[in-house]
């Protein structure tokens, strides 16, 4: 056992003495030691109950002949951190989470790992850390919350509240309606109910085979979710000493491809691109941002979920057959794009896992022949504005897929929010938000507040927004993020001026500023990078080491 390094032989008597202080007995030193990586925190609705989940898991591990050791990671709630300086810390928290998993697991030489994530950067951070450790690993998330319901009987989610701010600012709804939306949107514990980043990543864990069926869609705080916890705990005990189930044997090139196929079929958050690039790097798997358009071109978009379609939420997807039904439909009609021989954590191949899966409601999960789109729900655009690429969630587009407009430029998200409220962005404009990339922020803030304001003010179909920052999974509209190179590293987005004409063609995968090469060269000569004081030592360190978005915004020591 790996854990023999801390528990076997007379030289380890001091180690055992400390472990006895934690309650271990003689017989425990012959059992596998399993790390239970929790992410319990009171301030995140998807995490405040995870201490109870960890107890269920630990009890089941003990019943099955292993010794659990619970430890915790930090967590940041993107919705609560949104719209102020707190959002600077969201993406960097992913690296701290990865480091904490690696640190605890390797410092104590634990044999296997079960991770309990749920929201935002916590799932990808845990995946990155687990891949560094490379022991048998299972992920079992906290689960999504149910959708909210207003007094009028309308189904809503957190994204509805952000959009209501814009509607209230432009006097489209009353104060009473505004308060009703605020109080109804998040009715229970769990990750936010739409296909936002949390549910996207928990769904992709299922697609990669590192989580059991239902991980992405079974509601939080349900009996069904509790049974999933017990199944995961039993399974980690079965495989704790089996090297076939080391996480790098599960998250392979094939698994990563399957994840991106499901991402395209379900119109996942644009953040998944950032995270899968980082996860692939830790797994030693090749994934280039340029590859994603090929996958998208081969995969139909068959499940549309809020915020892209506000009548469908994660619990609806679960009732309709879940992630397995999506994969089964893709495999039956577009099977060549899925790697069906990929190994899953149960020991089955993906093909075996899907043998009984089927769509139970074709109004929720469509057949390929009746897909929302013949291509996937994400796209990578290239052009003089994004020579290294940028990302758009095509599933969330509500207007034209071609757009030409005049730039209205802002040098920060705060500046953009004030400008939008004051009416500086009008129909036909391209709202440009820059110096919000991984280095420029630093931290690559999400632009949910600006996009939601535009939607709520009735401009969602008539305005494009481009940024070197990123978007919440709750964003919809013609929103282009992750522009690389970013403004802070000399990207053209930093040289744009108000009135410059910008063209976006989603189907041609292009984004272009109609500015001559001569004019660009002139602007470069005159350009001086705006100086932004960063008081936080952690953010300064992050700024110095972080790569750009086209590489996953990872800390790069090379």
From Swiss-Prot:
Disulfide bonds: none annotated. One of its GO terms (molecular function) is dihydroxy-acid dehydratase activity. PANTHER family: D-XYLONATE DEHYDRATASE, D-XYLONATE DEHYDRATASE YAGF-RELATED. Belongs to the IlvD/Edd family. Homodimer. GO terms for cellular component: cytosol. GO terms for biological process: isoleucine biosynthetic process; L-valine biosynthetic process. Mg(2+) binds at residues 78, 120-121, 446. Keywords: 2Fe-2S, Amino-acid biosynthesis, Branched-chain amino acid biosynthesis, Iron, Iron-sulfur, Lyase, Magnesium, Metal-binding. Its EC number is 4.2.1.9. The modification N6-carboxylysine is found at residue 121. This is Dihydroxy-acid dehydratase. Binds 1 [2Fe-2S] cluster per subunit. This cluster acts as a Lewis acid cofactor. Its cofactor is [2Fe-2S] cluster; Mg(2+). Functions in the biosynthesis of branched-chain amino acids. Catalyzes the dehydration of (2R,3R)-2,3-dihydroxy-3-methylpentanoate (2,3-dihydroxy-3-methylvalerate) into 2-oxo-3-methylpentanoate (2-oxo-3-methylvalerate) and of (2R)-2,3-dihydroxy-3-methylbutanoate (2,3-dihydroxyisovalerate) into 2-oxo-3-methylbutanoate (2-oxoisovalerate), the penultimate precursor to L-isoleucine and L-valine, respectively. Pathway: Amino-acid biosynthesis; L-isoleucine biosynthesis; L-isoleucine from 2-oxobutanoate: step 3/4; Amino-acid biosynthesis; L-valine biosynthesis; L-valine from pyruvate: step 3/4. The active site is at 472 (proton acceptor). It catalyses: (2R)-2,3-dihydroxy-3-methylbutanoate = 3-methyl-2-oxobutanoate + H2O; (2R,3R)-2,3-dihydroxy-3-methylpentanoate = (S)-3-methyl-2-oxopentanoate + H2O. [2Fe-2S] cluster binds at residues 119, 192. Transmembrane segments: none annotated.
């Amino acid at each position: 056992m790996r854990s023999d390094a801390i528990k076997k032989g007379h030289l380890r008597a001091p180690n055992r003495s400390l472990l006895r202080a934690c309650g271990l007995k003689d017989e425990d030193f012959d059992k596998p030691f399993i790390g239970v990586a929790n992410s319990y925190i009171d301030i995140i609705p998807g995490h405040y109950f995870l201490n109870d989940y960890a107890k269920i898991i630990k009890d089941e591990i003990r019943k099955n002949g292993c010794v659990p050791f619970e430890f915790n990671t930090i967590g940041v709630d993107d919705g609560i951190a949104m719209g102020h300086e707190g959002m600077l810390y969201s993406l960097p928290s992913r690296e701290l989470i990865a480091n904490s998993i690696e640190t605890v697991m390797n410092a104590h030489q634990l044999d296997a790992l079960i991770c309990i994530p749920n929201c935002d950067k916590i799932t990808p951070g845990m995946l990155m850390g687990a891949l560094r450790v490379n022991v048998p690993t299972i992920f079992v998330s906290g689960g999504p919350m149910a959708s909210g319901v207003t007094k009028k009987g309308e189904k809503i989610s957190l994204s509805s509240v952000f959009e209501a701010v814009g509607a209230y600012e432009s006097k489209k709804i009353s104060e009473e309606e505004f308060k009703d939306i605020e109080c109804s949107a998040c009715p229970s514990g769990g990750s936010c109910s739409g296909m936002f980043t949390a549910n996207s990543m928990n769904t992709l864990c299922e697609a990669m085979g590192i989580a059991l069926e239902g991980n992405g869609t079974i509601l939080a705080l349900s009996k069904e979710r509790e049974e999933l916890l017990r199944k995961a705990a039993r399974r980690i005990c079965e495989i704790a000493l089996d090297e076939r189930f080391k996480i790098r044997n599960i998250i392979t090139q094939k698994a990563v491809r399957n994840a991106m196929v499901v991402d395209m079929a379900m119109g996942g958050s644009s953040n998944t691109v950032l995270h899968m690039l980082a996860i692939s790097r830790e797994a030693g798997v090749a994934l280039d941002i340029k590859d994603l358009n090929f996958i998208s071109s081969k995969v139909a978009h068959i499940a549309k979920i809020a915020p892209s379609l506000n009548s469908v939420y994660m619990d609806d997807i679960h009732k309709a057959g879940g992630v397995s039904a999506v994969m089964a439909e893709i495999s039956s009609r577009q099977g060549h794009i899925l790697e069906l021989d990929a190994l899953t954590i149960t020991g089955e191949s993906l093909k075996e896992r899907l043998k009984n899966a089927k769509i139970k409601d074709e109004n929720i999960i469509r057949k390929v022949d009746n897909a929302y789109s013949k291509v996937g729900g994400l796209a990578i655009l290239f052009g003089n504005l994004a020579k290294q690429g940028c990302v758009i969630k095509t599933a969330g587009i509500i207007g034209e897929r071609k757009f030409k407009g005049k730039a209205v430029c802002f040098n920060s998200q705060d500046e953009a929010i004030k400008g939008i409220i004051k009416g500086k962005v009008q129909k036909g404009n391209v709202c440009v938000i820059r110096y919000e990339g991984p280095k420029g922020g630093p931290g690559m803030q999400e632009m949910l507040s600006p996009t939601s304001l535009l939607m709520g003010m009735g401009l969602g179909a008539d305005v494009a927004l481009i940024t070197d920052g990123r978007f919440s999974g709750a964003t919809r509209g013609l929103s282009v993020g992750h522009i690389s190179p970013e403004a802070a590293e000399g990207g053209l987005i930093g040289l744009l001026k108000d009135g410059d004409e910008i063209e976006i063609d989603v189907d041609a995968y292009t984004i272009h500023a109609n500015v001559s090469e001569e004019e660009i060269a002139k602007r470069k000569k005159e350009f001086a990078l705006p100086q932004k004081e960063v008081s936080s030592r952690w953010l300064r360190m992050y700024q110095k080491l972080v790569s750009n978005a086209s590489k996953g915004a990872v800390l790069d020591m090379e």
